[in-house]
């Protein structure tokens, strides 16, 4: 498993399909070892969810979209939120990705929770934003909040991601 560099990421962005669609400013979003994703929207998480072994009883909690102010900012009190990214990711069958919050979030008492991004996944993903800071946290629309780190696999997978989140939020 090898972490991809910005040079390798640029080639994958120019490929078809592009590794990353809908980037706001790809030159800013490409980092030495990853790609930064930007904030499209913030939602509340209302109610409980459920997960089981075969997903037949999976339930996702509801939530409502929070509005940014006229200046593009939103103040989030301490709590948990769901965030949606602007970018659509197309992960080739020989790569997987791990996401990490930008260090600025952590320095502000806020973090992101996310899962492994599987080979073959395509979509505009969501993550959980956790505001630990008792004073809250301000976010501006389109802020760079997460960095995706792409790794080459030892071999291409035979079957890529095919779960319910395939092509999520792309329409």
Swiss-Prot record:
Hydrolase is among the record's keywords: yes
Gene3D superfamilies with a match to the protein in the record: 2.70.40.10
Highest taxon listed in the record's lineage: Archaea
Residue runs in coiled coils: none
GO molecular function: dCTP deaminase activity; dUTP diphosphatase activity
Annotated pathway: Pyrimidine metabolism; dUMP biosynthesis; dUMP from dCTP (dUTP route): step 2/2
Known EC number: 3.6.1.23
Family assignment from sequence similarity: Belongs to the dCTP deaminase family. Archaeal dUTPase subfamily.
Role, per record: This enzyme is involved in nucleotide metabolism: it produces dUMP, the immediate precursor of thymidine nucleotides and it decreases the intracellular concentration of dUTP so that uracil cannot be incorporated into DNA.
The protein's name: Probable deoxyuridine 5'-triphosphate nucleotidohydrolase
